[in-house]
Amino acid sequence: GLGDVYKRQNMDSHFLQLDNRKGQDRTMHSLNTEQIQQIIPHRHPFLLIDQIEDYVPGEYAVGYKGVSYHEDFFRGHFPQKAVMPGVLILEALAQTGAVAILSLPENRGKIAFFGGVQKCRFKGMVLPGDRLRLETRIIKRKGPVGVGEATASVDGKTVVTAELTFMVGE
């Protein structure tokens, strides 16, 4: 509809501004949930990032998820002690990396598929009420395949680190 055309024009303008920066000033570039959904295909209930605080296409993204007690996964993980499942933290990190990789002009409209997880360490728990900080830096890319170095933290304390392999496809 007309609203989609307007949103698309706004995102195209946003991407054009990023494309024209060419490493000039390093000001922060943030995205809200609506803008995130124009880059990656994930939707509720599986969109696990609320905001991107900063990103550079093809290089890195830093995002956040506000972890609410009302998340569906807390009903069964665990009823007596609500803890965010580690695999969902990894997925949130992957989605953050997908923002960095899929915001490249040549990857718009594509999907970043999970290829693997290496060097994963769970170092702490994520609980209801936490603000989960997600950072993924693209450290290798060859054709459609790449690797991201990912770190999740709460209040400055690292809770998960991993290397995430991805493949960009249609």
Outline where the language-model segments fall.
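HotDog/MaoC-like acyl-thioester-processing domains
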Residues: 41, 57, 127-130, 137-170
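Short, small-residue-biased leader/transition segments that mark boundaries at the very start
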Residues: 1-6
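Hydrophobic beta-strand-centered segment that forms part of the acyl-chain substrate-binding groove
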Residues: 28-30, 97-133, 159-161, 166-167
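Short, Lys/Arg-enriched N-terminal segments with co-localized hydrophobic residues
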Residues: 7-10, 15-27
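Conserved positions in beta-strands of structured domains
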Residues: 50-53, 118, 123, 135-139
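Active-site helix/loop of acyl-thioester processing domains in fatty-acid/polyketide metabolism
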Residues: 52, 84-107
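Catalytic strand-loop segment that frames the active site of acyl-thioester-processing enzymes
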Residues: 44-84
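Short aromatic-glycine motifs in intrinsically disordered, low-complexity regions
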Residues: 33-43
